[in-house]
């Protein structure tokens, strides 16, 4: 019988514990972790993500600000706004919601964020810390997946881990985090040949490609742990993952659902990293 990895329940448990830590920090040091999320344009999916982040931040006792900008805002104006929050001592985490309009360069915006406040973990300084084995701010989705492995007692050392998708947001940082735990990692992508054969060798299969139900049972060996990062809509508007959940569940030993799997953990790690940034600020 397959075991469901319940990211929603784990996220609720972690956020409740985080709220207590925030309360203690406020009582002992007079510090409230501050998070600002900047949303450019009216992308419907981005608006949902931002609302969820704001709701979770407020529930955990954070100072939460959301700045909504027109998609006509110029890059210089956005960088100027980021610089204001870089200098604001009440803000410990800055997140610019991606994707951005085409006329704004993502890399320039990420570079503009103070690495100490880069709670998304995308700044080159933070990725450098990750690649050198000294992670500080880590992209939130891979960080959340690592927490799931820990909470569910999933052994990583010596295991074959296959990641489908090589993005800077999930695939690449996920690979490094697994390497740090002594897993043997294969990072695959759209040009990978004989993908199904490679995936069938995985003890741990992590899928983040943005194609609904792409991974079927032909890609999965019996007893594998399957982590589905995908968030897609089917023809009826229903939220589905990159993994064909029903048929893959027949083979997997453990699997994350969509929704209710990885997504809630991503938001939880965003809050955790903002809290840790506030702690570091106190110790300076």
UniProtKB/Swiss-Prot annotation:
Its EC number is 1.5.1.5, 3.5.4.9. One of its GO terms (cellular component) is cytosol. PROSITE patterns: THF_DHG_CYH_1, THF_DHG_CYH_2. It comes from the Bacteria. NADP(+) binds at residues 165-167, 190. HAMAP family: THF_DHG_CYH (MF_01576). PANTHER family: C-1-TETRAHYDROFOLATE SYNTHASE, CYTOPLASMIC, C-1-TETRAHYDROFOLATE SYNTHASE, CYTOPLASMIC-RELATED. This is Bifunctional protein FolD. It comes from Streptococcus equi subsp. equi (strain 4047). The lineage of its organism: Bacteria, Bacillati, Bacillota, Bacilli, Lactobacillales.
């Amino acid at each position: 019988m397959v075991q469901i990895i319940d990211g929603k329940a784990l996220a609720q448990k972690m956020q409740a514990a985080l709220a207590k830590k925030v309360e203690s920090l406020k009582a002992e040091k007079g510090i409230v972790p501050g998070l600002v999320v900047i949303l450019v344009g009216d992308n419907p999916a981005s608006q949902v993500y931002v609302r969820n982040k704001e709701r979770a931040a407020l529930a955990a006792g954070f100072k939460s600000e959301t700045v909504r900008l027109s998609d006509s805002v110029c890059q210089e104006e956005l960088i100027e706004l980021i610089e204001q929050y870089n200098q604001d001592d009440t803000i410990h985490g800055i997140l610019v919601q991606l994707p951005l309009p085409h006329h704004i360069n993502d890399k320039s915006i990420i570079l503009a964020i103070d690495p100490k406040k880069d709670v998304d973990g995308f700044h080159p300084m933070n990725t450098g810390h990750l690649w050198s084995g000294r992670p500080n701010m880590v992209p939130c989705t891979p960080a959340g997946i690592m927490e799931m492995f820990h909470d569910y007692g999933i052994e990583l050392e010596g295991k074959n881990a296959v990641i489908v998708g090589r993005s800077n947001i999930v695939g690449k940082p996920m690979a490094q985090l697994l390497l740090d735990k002594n897993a043997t990692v294969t990072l695959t992508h759209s040009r990978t040949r004989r993908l199904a054969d490679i995936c069938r060798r995985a003890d741990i299969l992590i899928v983040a490609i943005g194609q609904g139900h792409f991974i079927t049972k032909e890609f999965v060996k019996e007893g594998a742990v399957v982590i589905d990062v995908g968030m897609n809509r089917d023809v009826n508007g229903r939220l589905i993952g990159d993994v064909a959940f029903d048929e893959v569940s027949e083979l997997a030993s453990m699997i994350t659902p969509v929704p209710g799997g990885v997504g809630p953990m991503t938001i939880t790690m965003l809050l955790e990293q903002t809290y840790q940034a506030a702690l570091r600020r106190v110790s300076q």
